[in-house]
Amino acid sequence: MSLSVTRENFDEWMVPVYVPAPFIPVRGEGSRLWDQQGKEYIDFAGGIAVNALGHAHPALREALNEQANRFWHIGNGYTNEPALRLAKKLIDATFAERVFFCNSGAEANEAALKLARKYAHDRVGNHKSGIVAFKNAFHGRTLFTVSAGGQPTYSQDFAPLPPDIRHAAYNDLNSASALIDDNTCAVIVEPVQGEGGVIPATKAFLQGLRELCDRHQALLIFDEVQTGVGRTGELYAYMHYGVTPDILTTAKALGGGFPIGAMLTTQDYASVMTPGTHGTTYGGNPLATAVAGKVLDIINTPEMQNGVRQRHDAFIERLNTLNVRFGMFSEIRGLGLLLGCVLQTEFAGKAKLIAQEAAKAGVMVLIAGGDVVRFAPALNVSDEEIATGLDRFALACERLQTGGVPCG
C-alpha cells in the first residue's frame, strides 16, 4: 500500500531549496493536469519549457516502455543503439558533427565551458581562459555554470567562484566588445534570456558576437536549453538569426519530460576532448535517448514548427485582448511559445502573486523574475486549451486588478 503524502510532508522531509505550490499534481494528459483533489489545471508552465509534447504523450510512453523492456543502463564503457540513433538525428538536423550526452542543461553547459577552456589550452595556451557571459543570464546550478550566469543572487553565497568570468550587458554589443579580447576562450549566450525576463536577442547582437568571437578566436556557445527543440518555431533558435554557434547546448524539451541533456559541436572542437577528459555515468542512457529520439521525430517537422508559429500568434492575440481589458502589462514579448508579459509599474514585483492566483483559477504559469509572467506551454497545445487557459488567467488578472488580491 502506497504511503499517503501531503504538501506539508515536503517541508518535513525535503531540503528546502524550493517552495512548491500548495497542491500536488498526480496525473497529466496533454496540456491538462489533475491534483490530489481532482482539480483540473491547464498547464502553460510545461515543467519550465520541458514538456514540449504535453504530459503522457502516447508515442513517448511507447518508446519508453519498449526500451524499458530491453535494458535500462549499461554505462559509458559501452555504447547503445538509441544513443547512436539520437546523435545522428541531431547531427543531421543541425550544424553539429559531434554530440556529448548528459542528463541536464547545467551538465551540458558545464561540458561546453570545459571544452572551450580545453580547446584554448591545447591550441593557444593557459592564458586564453576568459569567459564572457551576460548579466541576468542563467546557465545552471553547478559552481561553474552558476558563476557564468549573471545573477549574483544564485552565486554570491558560494565563493570563491571560478575565476576569469566576466559579464556584459545583454543585447549591448558595445558592452560585450569591451570585454572580449584575445584572452577570451568563449562567449556563452542565450538567444532568448529565459530566467532573465524572456528577452529575445537582437539579430545584430548575435551577429556581432559571432564577428567578435571570430576576430579573437573565441568559441561562441549558444545555450539553447530553454529555446531548443522547437520552442521558438525553429528546431533551434540560432536558425532564426542566421548565426551558427561553435557549441550548442540543449536539454529540457529534448526528452519531453525525461531527463537528458546534450552538447553539440564540430569535429575540430570535439577532438580535444580525448578519453578521460570528461564523462558522465548516466549520460546517453538508452531510456533517455530512446524517448528523445521519438521527441525529435515528432517535433522536427514543418507541420509542428508551423503550428508553433500559429499558436504564438493565438497567444499574442489573446494576451493583447486581455491587456486591453486590464492594462496590466507594459510589454508582451518572446519567440514562439516562450512568452513573457512584463508587468506595469503599478504591479511591479507581483508576478509570483499572479502565478499563484492563476493556479487557483486552474491554469499554471511561470515567472521570470518579479516583474514578468512567463508562458512555456506544450508545443501541441490546442486552440481550445489556449482559450480556456487564458480565460482562467484573466480571472487571476481581474482579482489582482480589482483588489480581490492585495497589490500593495
Curated annotation (Swiss-Prot):
Domain of life: Bacteria
Obligatory cofactor(s): pyridoxal 5'-phosphate
Keyword Transferase: yes
List of residues that carry N6-(pyridoxal phosphate)lysine: K252
Keywords of the record: Aminotransferase, Arginine metabolism, Pyridoxal phosphate, Transferase
Disulfide pairings: none
One Pfam family, short name: Aminotran_3
Substrates-to-products reaction catalysed: N(2)-succinyl-L-ornithine + 2-oxoglutarate = N-succinyl-L-glutamate 5-semialdehyde + L-glutamate
Pathway stated in the Swiss-Prot or TrEMBL entry: Amino-acid degradation; L-arginine degradation via AST pathway; L-glutamate and succinate from L-arginine: step 3/5
Gene Ontology annotations of biological process type: alpha-amino acid biosynthetic process; arginine catabolic process; arginine catabolic process to glutamate; arginine catabolic process to succinate; ornithine catabolic process
Enzyme class: transferase
Protein's job: Catalyzes the transamination of N(2)-succinylornithine and alpha-ketoglutarate into N(2)-succinylglutamate semialdehyde and glutamate. Can also act as an acetylornithine aminotransferase.
Name this protein carries in UniProt: Succinylornithine transaminase
Organism: Salmonella typhimurium (strain LT2 / SGSC1412 / ATCC 700720)
